[in-house]
């Protein structure tokens, strides 16, 4: 924490001025109508909510019967990797937890944004249910995944928790900094998890896991981009060096995570490629917050080309039909309006 405080001292004056100016930010100003939905005032934020609403899915849609058969054909190392990945995913979801999202929702003073966060809180329950379903289907009992007992003591998990404490839970953090850090948590933490699961399911096995992974990855991309959208509404923004610091810190933590907690080589993947992919995701996120790329990384995974990445193909540039259930697509008669982060708000 000392190094963190020392870094921020460089920006002490401008951060103090920004803290004072937060009360005048239109998103944060006291609003007596913050619980009254109509008329809609923030159309871009409302559109973001309606798009995630259209993407709604349930745990019951994930069928794991074929996955259970396919799982038995994997190598022991691959089975262990999936068990560890599920254990760490459940742990990571606890880092997101409802408390953090509720705090963001409480600070935001418009019903459009509160609706988005409320929907995310509900979906977090579904993600936990799906991960637990997989543990039950593949391993029968969490006790059969030894890592569950060790998670709390893993240095990499502690580093993620410390990152959240430094940048999000810390009362001294600016609202804009918290948005960037939350986007990093949603977009960078677990980026390699999604890539490794797509790598496995690209082999045309485990269709239930493939569907769940695609849904959750898509949703996380939407939550990440929502932070970018709120950030775009702010009148005053942090120094680009602070944004860069937040994102690159998250990258180093995530690289360490795959070097130590999830040895991807045993799963059949290349560690260097995972690291490059994390950097690629980070570059997109930096651009989403108006920064230049830091790593200039190229996506090493062809199978990830169609996966939404923050800053590369933003959630808000996709039409609602991309996220609707197939049964509802035919009902959409009006094309959605595309939103540009360069618009004046």
Swiss-Prot record:
One GO BP annotation of this record: deoxyribonucleotide biosynthetic process
Keyword Acetylation found: yes
Subcellular location: Nucleus
Numbered residues of crosslink Glycyl lysine isopeptide (Lys-Gly) (interchain with G-Cter in ubiquitin): 337
Record keywords: Acetylation, Deoxyribonucleotide synthesis, Isopeptide bond, Nucleus, Oxidoreductase, Phosphoprotein, Ubl conjugation
Pfam families assigned: Ribonuc_red_sm
MF-aspect GO terms: protein heterodimerization activity; ribonucleoside-diphosphate reductase activity, thioredoxin disulfide as acceptor
Tagged with keyword Ubl conjugation: yes
Active site positions: 131
InterPro entries on file: Ferritin-like_SF (IPR009078), RNR-like (IPR012348), RNR_small (IPR033909), RNR_small_AS (IPR030475), RNR_small_fam (IPR000358)
GO-annotated cellular components: cytoplasm; nucleus; ribonucleoside-diphosphate reductase complex
Function per UniProt: Provides the precursors necessary for DNA synthesis. Catalyzes the biosynthesis of deoxyribonucleotides from the corresponding ribonucleotides. RNR4 is required for proper folding of RNR2 and assembly with the large subunits.
Similarity comment: family membership: Belongs to the ribonucleoside diphosphate reductase small chain family.
Subunit structure and binding partners: Heterotetramer of two large (R1) and two small (R2) subunits. S.cerevisiae has two different R1 subunits (RNR1 and RNR3) and two different R2 subunits (RNR2 and RNR4). The functional form of the small subunits is a RNR2-RNR4 heterodimer, where RNR2 provides the iron-radical center and RNR4 is required for proper folding of RNR2 and assembly with the large subunits. Under normal growth conditions, the active form of the large subunits is a homodimer of the constitutively expressed RNR1.
Name listed for the protein in its UniProt record: Ribonucleoside-diphosphate reductase small chain 2
Organism, as annotated: Saccharomyces cerevisiae (strain ATCC 204508 / S288c) (Baker's yeast)
């Amino acid at each position: 924490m000392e190094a963190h405080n020392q870094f921020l001292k460089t920006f002490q004056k401008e951060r103090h001025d920004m803290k004072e100016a937060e009360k005048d930010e239109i998103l944060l100003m006291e609003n007596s109508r913050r619980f009254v939905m109509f008329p809609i005032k923030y159309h871009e934020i409302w559109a973001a909510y309606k798009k995630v609403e259209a993407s709604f899915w349930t745990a019951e849609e994930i069928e794991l019967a074929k996955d259970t058969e396919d799982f038995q054909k994997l190598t022991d190392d691959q089975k262990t990797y999936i068990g560890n990945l599920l254990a760490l995913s459940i742990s990571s979801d606890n880092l997101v937890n409802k408390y953090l999202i509720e705090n963001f929702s409480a600070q935001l003073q418009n019903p459009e944004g509160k609706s988005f966060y409320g929907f995310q809180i509900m979906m977090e329950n579904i993600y936990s249910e799906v991960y637990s379903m997989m543990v039950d289907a593949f391993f029968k009992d969490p006790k059969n995944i030894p890592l569950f007992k060790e998670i709390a003591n893993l240095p990499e998990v502690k580093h993620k928790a410390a990152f959240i404490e430094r940048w999000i839970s810390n009362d001294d953090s600016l609202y804009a900094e918290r948005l960037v850090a939350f986007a990093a948590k949603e977009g960078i933490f677990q980026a390699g998890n999604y890539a490794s699961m797509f790598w496995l399911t690209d082999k045309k096995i485990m269709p239930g896991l493939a569907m769940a992974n695609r849904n959750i990855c898509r949703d996380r991309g939407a939550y990440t981009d929502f932070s970018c959208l709120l950030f775009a509404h702010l009148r005053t923004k942090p120094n680009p060096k602070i944004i860069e610091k937040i994102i690159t810190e998250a990258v180093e933590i995530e690289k360490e995570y795959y070097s130590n907690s999830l040895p991807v080589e045993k799963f059949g993947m290349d560690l260097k490629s995972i690291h490059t992919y994390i950097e690629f995701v980070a570059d997109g996120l930096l651009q989403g917050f108006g920064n230049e790329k830091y790593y200039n990384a190229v996506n090493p995974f062809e199978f990830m080309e169609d996966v939404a990445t923050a800053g590369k193909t933003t959630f808000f540039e996709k039409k609602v039909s991309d996220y609707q259930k197939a049964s509802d697509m035919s009902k959409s008669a009006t094309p959605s309006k595309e939103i540009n982060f360069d618009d004046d708000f």
